Regions:
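Hydrophobic helix-and-loop "lid/oligomerization" segment in the mid-to-C-terminal part
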Residues: 2-121, 139-146, 197-440, 462-464
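Short gly/pro/ser/thr-enriched loop/turn and capping motifs at secondary-structure boundaries
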Residues: 104, 131, 154-161, 176-177, ...
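Generic beta-sheet signal
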Residues: 125, 149-153, 170-172, 388
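Mid-to-C-terminal polyanion-binding domains and interfaces
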Residues: 59-61, 226, 312-361, 365, ...
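Active-site core of PLP-dependent enzymes with the aminotransferase class I/II
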Residues: 127-140
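Catalytic metal-binding/acid-base residues of hydrolase active sites
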Residues: 72, 128, 154-156, 175, ...
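Short alpha-helices
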Residues: 161-218, 425-426
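Short amphipathic alpha-helical segments
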Residues: 80, 135-137, 162-163
Length: 584
């Protein structure tokens, strides 16, 4: 028997209005949240050092610039924005672009090359706020005096002096007069370009709001903040009205048209577009990452690629980079599948499978796949996961929480043990390190905790089998509201009667669907749902051929004439003597 899911109603009564859903998630002013006013934008003048940064630009006008591209979507969009802005303003003579050869941040791996090149100004977007040591090395080993500009949103290391003396840093976290701490790297770059626009009487920065939207969504900026939400929605409006300027973003959206439909949303950027870019950053070689950056800056260069059945084909840089992304998405999936076989075997053969937290040794897994593997394991075991590898007495890796379990904030849970030397990131997605001597103490704590395998869903309403299309469509039409700090609402539907002829199972066994009252219910899985299919067979055999279904999931609008759908997160089934009338 598979574990049945359980649920708790949010609030003291069922919720039927969008306003109530949003208020339950911490939205105070629903009207402004849905349509953020322009006066929610903070004045760029309030950033510490922004005038110094502007003067740095003027000092280096018509000189050579080195640009560091940080290795995530926020980093690529940040660098692409400042690159295009500089070229458009004719600020510089030449820009040398540096992509990382591995998943590293800042200039720790690039400082020697940066010190030896011919640049006068080094620009580091979305990183560098704590790289004083490497900036010192650049200044000491460079033959010419170099200026360094950091445009970042990460917290500065508390061990360092408050002010950096070897670079100019513009950072919302380090600016007391800036209230919005949710801006990501691309948001900081946009605000800086907005400041430059005002100084030179231009209006270029808004042309890059599609990059701002993608980078901020991918970096999980909390969009309950009105300024951040305003910027993302403005970028999405440009995309949906076909007024945006970035050719590569358009190319990626075009290839995902079937999944996305007619309107690109916050969730689409986060779950359809960003993963394609991340796959290239994780799996791609330097040449492929450089090609993707050129696609991001609207390069007009053409490339050639061999296509099966067509031979060598000439194509735009944007199509070339998109095809690289698609290839590397498949490569990434294959690698995760390969790694997961050994890791799951390792877990199942140890006592850790009975603990409230899964800990996996990922010494044979490439660093760039650690977080993805942790995601997969958290979904597989329905509990928090630590994937770590040992190096010089320290275990380092990634942590992923499971919000439907008993530990709501895995980051805080680990921090409270005071055993971990580093837990940095989001509540349920972060980097982690622990002294290997502390691991046994942590395991002892886990062994004393009672493990509750129940999966609890926090839901907004419970519907019986009289549920109709209008209710589903009412909630489904707000699909463009959710994402990045505002979760899609979950609902329960009870009492659905099905027979085996109503259930459709995909050939891969990764999708199970059925219809009720012309509402399409579908459950997807990353792996074949063997246990659920076996349970379905047993229930059909033990009753009169009918089963009663209870589901929890999200209401959606289908792409075909806005049909009513529910994407099922979890399902309970049992045999029943009740009959399904007239096909439901």
């Amino acid at each position: 028997m598979i574990n049945a899911f359980k649920y708790k109603l949010i609030g003291d009564k069922p919720i039927v209005k969008l306003e109530e859903i949003l208020k339950q998630q911490g939205v105070e002013n629903v009207k402004d949240f849905l349509n953020p006013p322009i006066d929610c934008l903070e004045n760029p003048n309030n950033f510490d050092n922004i005038e110094k940064a502007s003067q740095l630009f003027n000092k280096n006008k018509k000189r050579n610039v080195s640009l560091v591209v940080d290795c995530d979507v926020d980093g690529f969009t940040s660098a692409a924005l400042i690159y295009q802005y500089l070229m458009r303003c004719e600020f510089v003579n030449d820009i040398a672009v540096y992509c990382h050869s591995a998943k590293q941040h800042g200039v720790s791996d690039l400082h020697y090359a940066l010190s030896k090149d011919e640049s006068d100004l080094i620009i580091i977007p979305d990183a560098g706020s704590s790289d004083d040591e490497y900036f010192n090395q650049i200044h000491q080993t460079s033959c010419v005096k170099k200026d360094i500009l950091v445009l970042d949103h990460h917290l500065r290391d508390k061990k360092l002096p408050k002010e950096c003396t070897t670079a100019i840093i513009v950072n919302n976290q380090m600016s007391d007069k800036i209230n919005n701490k949710t801006l990501t790297g691309v948001g900081i770059v946009y605000k800086f370009c907005k400041y430059l626009d005002k100084k030179q009487n231009t209006n270029y920065s808004d042309d890059y709001l599609d990059l701002v939207a993608l980078g901020m969504v991918a970096d999980k900026a909390n969009l309950r903040n009105l300024e951040s939400r305003y910027l993302v929605l403005q970028g999405l409006n440009q995309i949906n009205q076909h007024k945006n300027k970035n050719l590569f973003i358009n190319e990626l959206i075009k290839c995902k048209k079937f999944s996305i439909g007619n309107e690109v949303t916050i969730l689409d950027l986060g779950f359809q577009i960003a993963p394609m870019i991340n796959s290239t950053i994780r799996c791609g070689v330097m040449q492929e990452n450089n090609a993707m950056f050129q696609a991001f800056v609207n390069s007009e260069q053409t490339m050639r690629m061999y296509l099966r059945g067509k031979g060598e084909v000439k194509m735009s840089m944007q199509e070339y980079a998109r095809r690289i992304c698609e290839t590397l998405v498949r490569k990434q999936k294959a690698k995760i599948a390969k790694y997961s076989v050994d890791i799951i075997k390792q877990i199942n053969e140890s006592d850790i499978k009975n603990y409230p937290v899964i800990i996996a040794d990922v010494k044979n897994v490439e660093n760039t796949f650690t977080g993805l593997l942790a995601n997969m394991l958290a979904s597989e075991y329905k509990r928090p996961v630590l994937c770590m590898r040992a190096n010089k007495g320290i275990l380092r890796g990634s942590g992923r929480g499971f919000e439907k379990g008993s530990i709501n904030d895995f980051n805080q849970f680990l921090t409270d043990t005071q055993l971990f030397s580093m837990v940095e990131g989001h509540p349920n997605s972060f980097g982690v390190s622990i002294d290997i001597d502390n691991l046994d103490i942590f395991l002892d704590k886990l062994s004393q905790m009672e493990y509750n395998p129940d999966t609890y869903y926090h839901i907004y309403n419970i519907f019986d089998n009289s549920l109709g299309q209008l209710t589903v469509k009412h909630f489904g039409k707000y699909h463009n509201v959710y994402g990045n700090g505002v979760d899609e609402p979950l609902f329960v539907v009870k009492g659905i009667i099905c027979n085996k002829y109503n259930i459709k199972i995909s050939p891969s066994q990764k999708a199970i669907s059925f219809k009720w009252h012309n509402i399409e219910f579908t459950k997807y899985s990353r792996s074949p749902m063997v246990d659920l299919i076996d349970e379905l067979d047993k229930c059909f055999e033990s009753g009169n051929g009918n089963i009663e279904i209870e589901v929890v999931g999200k209401f959606k609008l289908g792409s075909y004439k806005d049909s009513a759908m529910m994407i099922v997160d979890d399902i309970n089934i049992k045999p029943t003597d009740k009959c399904r009338l007239f096909g439901g």
